[in-house]
Amino acid sequence: MALSSIFGGGSPSQQSNLPTSSASSSVKDQLKGQIAQELAVANATELVNKVTENCFEKCLMAPYTSKQDTCVDQCLAKYMRSWNAISQAYVARIQQASANGDI
């Protein structure tokens, strides 16, 4: 084994196997997309868990009455309004950071 191959001085055909910047950029974009999807799933799961924990525990009691439907509907609507406001603010911050080159 020659020392040149150990220190990166191998033949040009060996060096051409390295990924190009466009290929690594594509991989980076794919990873970003996958991470964004996983975060969206995690956030949706967290929303469902919080709604279940807070709204149903607050509103549903034995014996069941129709007032509980109204309570659950209002509680769910409150969480969805809050979720939408927070999501919009988060997306705006991410877009601003991306435009500034911070991301």
UniProtKB/Swiss-Prot annotation:
GO biological process entries: protein insertion into mitochondrial inner membrane
Recorded superkingdom: Eukaryota
Compartments (UniProt record): Mitochondrion inner membrane
Positions with biased composition (Polar residues): 12-25
Membrane topology listed for this record: Peripheral membrane protein
GO cellular component: mitochondrial inner membrane; mitochondrial intermembrane space protein transporter complex
Keyword Hydrolase: no
Keyword set, alphabetical order: Chaperone, Disulfide bond, Membrane, Metal-binding, Mitochondrion, Mitochondrion inner membrane, Protein transport, Translocation, Transport, Zinc
Keyword flag Cell membrane: no
Record motif Twin CX3C motif, residues: 55-75
Region (Disordered): 1-25
Disulfide bonds: 55-75, 59-71
GO molecular function: metal ion binding; protein transporter activity
Free-text comment about domains: The twin CX3C motif contains 4 conserved Cys residues that form 2 disulfide bonds in the mitochondrial intermembrane space. However, during the transit of TIM13 from cytoplasm into mitochondrion, the Cys residues probably coordinate zinc, thereby preventing folding and allowing its transfer across mitochondrial outer membrane.
Quaternary structure note: Heterohexamer; composed of 3 copies of TIM8 and 3 copies of TIM13, named soluble 70 kDa complex. Associates with the TIM22 complex, whose core is composed of TIM22 and TIM54. Interacts with the transmembrane regions of multi-pass transmembrane proteins in transit.
Family of this protein: Belongs to the small Tim family.
Protein name, UniProt field: Mitochondrial import inner membrane translocase subunit TIM13
Species annotation: Eremothecium gossypii (strain ATCC 10895 / CBS 109.51 / FGSC 9923 / NRRL Y-1056)
Gene: TIM13
